[in-house]
Regions:
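N-terminal ligand-binding/catalytic initiation module
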Residues: 1-155, 381, 385-389
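Adenosine-phosphate binding glycine-rich loop
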Residues: 158, 282-390
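A short, aliphatic-rich alpha-helical micro-motif
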Residues: 124, 182, 250-251, 271-274
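General beta-strand structural signal in soluble alpha/beta enzymes
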Residues: 105, 131-134, 155-158, 189, ...
């Protein structure tokens, strides 16, 4: 039995990976009158007078919705909301297991940006935060932007920002090994979708100066015209030397390759054309842009992938539970760049100087101390940047 067959049996036996459980026992009339009528009227009156007290009298403070329309699910693509539900259930239990955040899945039977936004806004009073998941680009950018403008609770598209945070944390540690500075790097980001865009913007916020973003047609540059406005935006904030050409052209003399694209598109010759002590994060799944052994044999110093069976897995589970834990604990109104960079530092710092080596730049997912570090770093950054409300 392979992993897929075993997982199918696992899911069939469970009939759902999460459930609603009560935090109180109702064993007599007094319990009933406290938890429900008539006593429940008093917290209702208090919340009506002061809406902020909902954080004291309900579970809003610790509740996150994992919201998807099922248009970009894993490597499966647009499989629709119902078929995406097992993924959203899985995400929800990771929130609970790793950071004690009460998360529940909501899948929406619409692809319309405005319908999704309006639906989420209408259910937001229940929530302390919103995790957007597996929504296709470029719609995901617009949905997140509109929700952030209209809501005063954290809205976080994990496929974008969770991936970007782990990439940055890995790069922080990789740079210690190769003894290079971020501002001196030539970085190639291959893939201009949700993850590639977020990675690029976070690296720029961190201090990178020379990033070239490639899509299937080559480097985004200011000599080209794009129908996708997000490509135009990327071309205006990256590629300072306005290089053009295919990936094989612009990767020459690069220090870092970050792939969120397609399998087997990086050759050994391309790696050899990069600068010495190159760093490659080849994150296409299940087949990376180049396999680690091939990259290493071609001269790469540090290699990461999206797979657990190779060293240095770029795994979002290291980020999103602790990020929401920290944001919820200080009732942050958003998750900003300062909080993301703080999370990346916390993850990177979870690998000690003694442990750090080319095959270990990112901590293991089951090191639960990482989530505590991330939560604390995010809390501190939220307070310092002025988005914490308690």
């Amino acid at each position: 039995m392979n992993i897929y067959e075993e997982s199918l049996q696992f899911h069939k036996q469970l009939r759902g990976k999460l459930e609603v459980s009560s935090r109180v026992k109702i064993t007599n009339e007094k319990d009933l009158s406290l938890a429900y009528t008539p006593g429940v009227a008093e917290p209702c009156r208090e919340i009506h007078k002061d809406p902020s007290t909902a954080y004291h009298y309900t579970r809003k403070w610790n509740t996150v919705a994992v919201i998807s329309d099922g248009t970009a699910v894993l490597g499966l693509g647009d499989i629709g909301p119902l078929a995406s539900l097992p993924v959203m259930e899985g995400k929800s239990i990771l929130f609970k297991e790793f950071a004690d955040v009460d998360a529940f899945p909501i899948v929406l039977d619409t692809k319309d940006v405005n319908e999704i936004v309006e639906t989420v806004v209408r259910i937001a009073p229940t929530l302390g935060g919103i995790n957007l998941e597996d929504i296709s680009a470029p719609r995901c950018f617009e949905i997140e932007k509109k929700l952030k403008e209209r809501l005063n609770i954290p809205v976080f598209h994990d496929d974008q920002h969770g991936t970007a945070i782990i990439v940055l944390s890995g790069l922080m540690n990789a740079l210690k090994i190769v003894n290079k500075k971020v501002e001196d790097l030539k970085i190639i980001v291959n893939g201009a979708g949700s993850a590639g865009t977020a990675i690029t913007k976070l690296l720029l916020s961190y201090g990178a100066k020379n990033i070239i973003v490639c899509d299937r047609d080559g480097a985004l540059n200011r000599n080209s015209t794009y129908s996708n406005p997000y490509f135009t935006e990327l071309s205006n904030i990256t590629n300072p030397n306005n290089e053009s050409g295919l990936l094989c052209d612009v990767i020459k003399n690069a220090d870092v390759f970050i792939g969120v694209s397609a399998p087997n598109i990086v050759s050994k010759e391309m790696v050899t054309s990069m600068n010495s002590d190159s760093i490659l994060f080849a994150m296409a799944n299940p087949t990376p842009e180049i396999f680690p052994d091939d990259a290493k044999n071609a001269g790469a110093k540090v290699i990461g992938t999206g797979r657990s069976d190779f060293p240095n897995q770029i795994n979002n589970v290291l980020a999103f539970p602790g990020i929401f834990r920290g944001a919820l604990d200080v009732r942050a109104t958003e998750i900003n760049e300062e909080m993301k960079i703080a999370a990346a530092h916390a993850i990177a710092d979870s690998v000690s100087d003694e442990e750090l080596n080319p095959n270990y730049i990112i901590p293991k997912a089951f090191n639960l101390d990482v989530q505590k570090r991330v939560a604390q770093a995010v809390k501190d950054a939220a307070i310092k940047s002025g988005v914490a409300t308690i």
